[in-house]
Amino acid sequence: MLDNTYMSAGVSATLLSFLFLIHGCLGQAPPVQLTYRATGSSPEVIAVYEAWFGTPKHISVGYTSHDPEVIRNQIRKAKGMGISAFVVDWYGDREPFIDQSYALVQNLAAKNEFKVAMMYEEANVEEGATDEAIADFTMFHDIYLSPDAPGHQAYLTYQGRPLIFVFPNGNHTDWAKVRAVVNKWNPAPLLIQENLPGPHPDAFDGFYPWINPGPLGWAADGSNWGDRYLADFYKNMAEKYSDKLIVGGAWPKLDDHKASWSLNRHISARCGQTYTETLNMWRKFFPAGQTIPFVMIETWNDYEEGSEIEPGIPTCTEPSSKTALNNQVKSSLATTTQR
């Protein structure tokens, strides 16, 4: 069995660029008219960012999320890989350490021509989840989105509206009530929730897929990497929810054995194929001219669940495989240029 290693940032950037040059070349997509489309010819690539390293509740990864130099280096590397924004997991005042990390990321993003967004971790409590969410969103707006907030100009927007992602936990929040509150902001945010519409479809402006093995469930060898899950997500969004903002999903692998909450879940990197195929899956469902606005990499640095891309795109150790991949990218780029 081949071990996983990582390509250099240069190869990563080349591959990422190539992947987004070939839109329209990967099969016939059904006709669809999107309300929210990419502002350019390709989706903007963003990445989920964990800001909890340095606390005793999480494993040591050799750095703390409170080190400005670490964050500057991460931003520089992400930009070199074609990533334009970090989507930071955020828990409101439930996790002060993470809140402080977020402030650092936003400030440094503003100074380094990078973007940042918040992914709200819903409180998993039966009573008070709605009030908690409203209080957290209000806090976030006042501290990070107001005109005098440090680094507010770095916040990720679409057509001038800030994007806020929601990661559901327990589904106890009345999002219609939260929506009514945030609609009073100027500008009102675009709320993006995981998976397809649930009990409050009108409360959300868009949806994103999350790492999932698909209907066959988790395989011991990691061979169920999520192709059917992603296909179902994109098919449903194209056919039923083309009026919503669609954020695509991509993941390199998953192995959560290091996490204290481990469920022994595993998705094989397949020598980098899992990443490249998830990154491109959306193309099969959306034709040229109907490009989705964002693709979100899951994740930049979740080392506990083993979905990190910070070290680079997973590949295989054999030298010939790297040479073959480089040749494949160069050949495909030449073909694309001639089209």
Range-by-range predicted roles:
Residues M1-L16:
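Classical eukaryotic N-terminal signal peptides for Sec-dependent ER targeting/secretion
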Residues T5-Y6, L19, T39, V70:
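Residues at the start of alpha-helices and the adjacent loop-to-helix junctions
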Residues F18-P31:
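N-terminal signal peptide
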Residues Q28-R339:
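Glycan-processing catalytic domains of CAZymes
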